[in-house]
């Protein structure tokens, strides 16, 4: 118990020291570049009403769908330990077929073309 308390105290102390140093060091040498906000490549001082690329939005949504596919298919190897492993294989196959049909549809509609 004593070892746990001392390691928690040491961790808290090191975290506080690092947080203090992280806030203290940038204030030693401020300049315009360090004090300006950074917004992922966008100019934060410009107009907020810039048009958003619909193509980029579509590619981002497709990425999220295929990322979700990986999350759904990740436990598939453990599905073989069920009483009826064919059910997990059926669900995985149906997910893959559905996403493949959606990808083919987007491809035929030209949604994957970045520039026309």
Swiss-Prot record:
It is found in: Mitochondrion membrane. It comes from the Eukaryota. It is an enzyme of class 7 (translocase). The keyword Transport applies. It is a multi-pass membrane protein. Coiled coil: none annotated. Gene3D superfamilies: NADH:ubiquinone/plastoquinone oxidoreductase, chain 3 (1.20.58.1610). Pfam families: Oxidored_q4. The keyword Iron-sulfur does not apply. The chain crosses the membrane at residues 8-28, 56-76, 87-107. GO terms for molecular function: NADH dehydrogenase (ubiquinone) activity. Its EC number is 7.1.1.2. GO terms for cellular component: mitochondrial membrane; NADH dehydrogenase complex. Keywords: Electron transport, Membrane, Mitochondrion, NAD, Respiratory chain, Translocase, Transmembrane, Transmembrane helix, Transport, Ubiquinone. It catalyses: a ubiquinone + NADH + 5 H(+)(in) = a ubiquinol + NAD(+) + 4 H(+)(out). InterPro entries: NADH_UbQ/plastoQ_OxRdtase_su3 (IPR000440), NDAH_ubi_oxred_su3_sf (IPR038430). Core subunit of the mitochondrial membrane respiratory chain NADH dehydrogenase (Complex I) that is believed to belong to the minimal assembly required for catalysis. Complex I functions in the transfer of electrons from NADH to the respiratory chain. The immediate electron acceptor for the enzyme is believed to be ubiquinone. Belongs to the complex I subunit 3 family. This is NADH-ubiquinone oxidoreductase chain 3. The gene is MT-ND3.
